[in-house]
């Protein structure tokens, strides 16, 4: 139910801020880690949240999944999102709306030691999308903390 509330709030904001009668589909880029990518879920292409969002929004929108498993916002993290081909493709897409769901992997112990750089690195990522020719609306999705099995790092 909580998930539906979040989706509902997002959709209200989306419809208020974007004209849904545009002749070209509104391009939505879903930026993120394995949660966005849909890792480990059955029938990922249909069940990941970007695919579900596409089904919900319909033909007036083109939602693309730019999720990359294990990625961080932190440029000093073990796998920075900004160093991926997926990131480059998301910029080339010139989205009208950008949903950013990153931060979970940043909370891993090996990455969180750079926590003082998190805010600046996040702002840099936001600014990069904000400065695209398409001038997209940017929506930040709250990251969840990474929970690792006891004894692993």
Predicted stretch roles:
Residues 20-23:
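Boundary at the C-terminal end of the N-terminal hydrophobic targeting segment
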Residues 8-17:
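Bacterial N-terminal signal peptides
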Residues 25-30, 35-123:
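Conserved SGNH/GDSL esterase-like catalytic core that processes O-acyl groups on lipids
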Residues 101-105, 128-153:
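Active-site segments of SGNH/GDSL-like serine hydrolases
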Residues 1-9:
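Bacterial N-terminal signal peptides that target proteins for export
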């Amino acid at each position: 139910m909580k998930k539906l509330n979040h989706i509902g709030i997002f959709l209200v904001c989306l419809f208020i801020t974007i004209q849904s009668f545009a002749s070209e589909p509104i391009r939505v880029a879903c930026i993120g880690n394995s949660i966005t990518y849909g890792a480990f879920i059955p029938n990922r292409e249909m069940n990941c949240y970007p695919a579900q969002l596409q089904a919900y929004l319909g033909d007036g929108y083109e939602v693309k999944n730019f999720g990359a498993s294990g990625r961080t916002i932190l440029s000093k993290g073990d796998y920075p999102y900004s160093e991926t081909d997926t990131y480059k493709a998301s910029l080339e897409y010139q989205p009208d709306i950008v949903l950013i769901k990153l931060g979970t992997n940043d909370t891993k112990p090996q990455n969180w030691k750079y926590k003082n750089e998190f805010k600046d690195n996040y702002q840099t990522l936001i600014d990069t999308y904000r400065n695209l020719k398409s001038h997209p609306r940017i929506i930040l999705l709250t990251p969840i903390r990474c929970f690792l099995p006891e004894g692993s790092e």
